[in-house]
Amino acid sequence: MSAAGILAFAQQGWEQVLAKVKWSVVYLDAACAESLHWSCGSSRLLEAVKGPACHLREFEPQAIGGGAKQPRAVFVLSSPLKGRIVDTLQSIICRSHFQHCVVVTAVSHAVHLTANHVPAAAAAELEGQQPVFEQLEEKLCEWMGNENYTAEVLHVPLFLAPVASHLAFTPAFATLFPLLPQDVHALNSARPDKRRLSSLGEVDATALTPELLLYIRCLVSGLSSLCEHLGVREECFAVGPLSRVIATDLANYAPAKNRKKTATGRASVVFVDRTLDLTGAVGHHGDNLVEKIMSVLPQLPGHTHDVMVNMAELTAVQAVEENQNVIAPGCLAPSNEASAKALWEALLNSKHKEAVMEVRRHLVEAASRENLPIKMSMGRVTPGQLMSYIQLFKNNLRALRNHCGLLQLGMATVQTLKHPQTAKWDNFLAFERLLLQSLGDSTMAGVLNQLLPMIKSSSQRTSDDLNPEELLILLIYIYSVPGDVTLDRDLGDVEEKVKKALAHVLSEESELSPLLQKITGCDSAVDLTLPKSQIAVNDVFMALREIAGARNLMRQFKSVYVPGNNTHQASYKPLLKQVVEEIFNPEKSDPIDIEHMSSGLTDLLKTGFSMFMKVSRPHPSDHPLLILFVVGGVTVAEAKMVKDLVASLKPGTQVMVLSTRLLKPLNIPELLFATDRLHPDLGF
């Protein structure tokens, strides 16, 4: 039951798929492609296919069908097999010449029964049977044009993308984000005949939209499969309203009943709502090179996390604009090289300065092994120095092949260090530190006043100034740090000034980024009038107010702000740090805000008896494995902090940090201001 179980679980799932793909055309959706990318890489899939790269295709309605000499197909999908997904399957198969079709879904058959509105009692009677999959197999044969052709539908839990031995994210759930009070109003409007919910604290599974409930059930299905792989029975805990819903669903997940009875190991699974601490999500204090790389380099198309690393300088192709797409980009996902894997682990677990030195050390060692004419230089590591080492590999094909993964990480480091956004990162950090001190000395109105001069229109801005998206990041930081703020006249006046300035800036933008298009509802800057900007900005500030009050439901974890005194400056104390410290508190009292979710009558009786007898309630530190799942995203620096903290507080305890996504600061404005949290797109 080691933390390496994350990678082993993901790879075991993909091995089941790889066993099916020989001589096949393989169609993958984006989430499964991303899981493959981080688990074993597309090269491993190509080896198993034993065909050219054109045999790998994106699963979409316009996808190219199989030709006359391509009788086999494998579809690898992250969604339930229903609606648009099935329509796309039919469309591709009907214009192909397939005689053998395999459909792999990351969603269990039990969840497919839920998706098809089969009552729980009827679903329990179908244990061991798979009628939904069997019906689709019949349809596949019908679409292929011959009932004697071969069709197979199976479930493989391909929901994790492992970044490291202690860290993984879930590509298919990248848009899952905790609810805000405005979502409660929407839920009340959608169910006028039912009891009104007065706050987020009253939200349970019965109150959610069918889409969100099914989305959660898909995640729970995957987590149950992970626990089965690890051989553990899980105790579920929650910090926050949406985490409570997810933890309750996992604790009572009916298909896991038999697994839990026979499991020999034990684990604590603690879910935490990201909205309880957005300071860590948008802050720039992590001092981690990987976070900076992911924030400044362009995103790899179709991926939520990996980036494009320009590798043209290692080729003879001239660096002109028309050649930009000639050379395939590099990326961060670790290759099979031992040195690249070692460097990737070092980058994840080191501070920025140490990480850059590790890049230099690995490049020097690789060059030495290849007998390249390296000139050693000590002292401060510069982008130019790293580039000079990388250039040594340029005309040596064998050396390039041997160290391709390492060189991609090296180039990513150089391009990040030279990127103008990296200098801005330090400016953000300086402002955030100033803000923490200001909160102790002045009011919220005073803090917002400091932001006002930074709000500039596109015609006034220089490259050092903040664009609208970056202003949103700072606003989230400002409202998340202090917690609930009292609206007095001063704050109301300054808020109005900030809103007015921001609305003017938005309406004067010459071009709208994809995020600003979503926030404003306008596809082009021409359509964005001042009144539309004002409506969008009012919505943003409503969400900011709700963020400020997110910890009101907490009794213990009410603050992430530590005021300064005569000896210490004011500081930020991450909520995740507080949660882990409370879990491993040597006093081991019942945690106030870390709720245990009962799984059936036995647990309920224990909880009831504990009120008047000496029956100990389950505690999250009881077990040798802690799985911490952050709903809404986690940063690389936070994952490292959790890992190090657990090792220091309770040596020998294994910890896995899982999340819906790896965060960079710009993700949060999108999840807050431009995502329909109640109606996730499940593909049907």
UniProtKB/Swiss-Prot annotation:
Acetylation among keywords: no
Pfam families from the UniProt entry: Sec1
Record carries keyword Mitochondrion: no
Keywords assigned by UniProt, alphabetized: Protein transport, Transport
GO annotation, biological process: protein transport; vesicle-mediated transport
Similarity section: Belongs to the STXBP/unc-18/SEC1 family.
Role description: May be involved in protein transport.
Name of this chain's protein: Sec1 family domain-containing protein 2
The species this protein was found in: Mus musculus (Mouse)
Chain's gene name: Scfd2
